[in-house]
Structure formats: C-alpha cells, structure tokens
C-alpha cells in the first residue's frame, strides 16, 4: 500500500510540475505579446509627438492640437496599462517558478522514497523466497531421511 502511495504522490507532483510549466509558458507568451504591443504603441506615440511638434512650429489650429493631444493621452494610458500588465506577468512568472521549483523538489523526494521502498520490498521478497526455498530443501531432506 505504501508503495502505491509513494508512486501516487510522485505522479501527483509530476502533474503539478507539468501544469506549472504550461502556466509559465502561457504567461511568458502573454508577456511577450504585450512587450511587442508596447513597442508598437511607443512608436506611434513618438510619431504623433513629432507630428504635433512639427505642426506647432508651422502653426496649428487649437482644434487639431486638442485632437493630437487627446490621442497622445489615450496612447499614454494604453502604454501604462501595457507596462502594468508586463510587470504583473513578470510577478506571476516569478511566483510560478518558485512553485515549479518547490514541486520539483517535492517530486524528487517522493521519487527517492519510492525507490527506497521498492528496494525494501524487493529485499523482503528475496528473503521470503530464500525462506521458502530453504524450507523446501529441508522438507526434501527430511523426506529422504
């Protein structure tokens, strides 16, 4: 029964490790997507800042300036949201790595205990086989005598 328990616990830890690995991969891809989006949005922001600067030098109506300014403000909010999402993803990745590492250690412990228990069972089986074999030989000897 204990043999099955150690084996079962080892399998559970392996499943936890697989689950955490998939989670890390998905969060990493999510973070990568937001980094790419952040670069794109920052590029747009720089482009519009250059345009408004050039138009301010050449002269721009108040209405156009307000439109550019509103758009740049919206971009800043979206950029900040992306930065916050990237930071949140990074924290989740770090926490997931800690959990993954803990599960790895726990899995190795259960694996080690499982191997020790298997060796112990094998040793007990060999002893029982030797006892049965010795009893069988003694029984044959007594029958001859």
Curated annotation (Swiss-Prot):
Location in the cell reads:
Cell membrane
Major place of residence: membrane
Instruction: List GO terms (cellular component aspect).
Output: bacterial-type flagellum; plasma membrane
Keywords in alphabetical order: Bacterial flagellum biogenesis, Bacterial flagellum protein export, Cell membrane, Chemotaxis, Membrane, Protein transport, Transport
Tell me which Gene Ontology terms the entry assigns under biological process.
Answer: bacterial-type flagellum organization; bacterial-type flagellum-dependent cell motility; chemotaxis; protein transport
Q: How does it sit in the membrane?
A: Peripheral membrane protein
Per its UniProt record, what InterPro entries does this chain match? Flag_assembly_chemotaxis_eff, Flagell_FliJ
Q: Tell me its family.
A: Belongs to the FliJ family.
Which function does this protein serve? Answer: Flagellar protein that affects chemotactic events.
Q: What is this protein called?
A: Flagellar FliJ protein
């Amino acid at each position: 029964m204990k043999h099955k328990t150690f084996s079962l616990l080892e399998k559970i830890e392996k499943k936890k490790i697989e689950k955490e690995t998939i989670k890390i991969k998905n969060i990493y891809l999510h973070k990568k997507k937001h980094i790419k989006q952040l670069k794109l949005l920052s590029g747009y922001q720089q482009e519009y800042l250059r345009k408004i600067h050039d138009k301010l030098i050449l002269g721009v109506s108040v209405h156009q300036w307000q439109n550019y300014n509103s758009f740049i403000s919206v971009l800043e909010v979206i950029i900040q949201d992306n930065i916050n999402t990237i930071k949140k993803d990074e924290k989740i990745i770090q926490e997931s790595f800690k959990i993954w590492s803990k599960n790895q250690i726990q899995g190795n412990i259960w694996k080690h205990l499982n191997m020790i228990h298997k060796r112990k069972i094998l040793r007990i089986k060999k002893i029982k086989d030797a006892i049965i074999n010795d009893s069988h030989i003694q029984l044959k000897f007594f029958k001859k005598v």
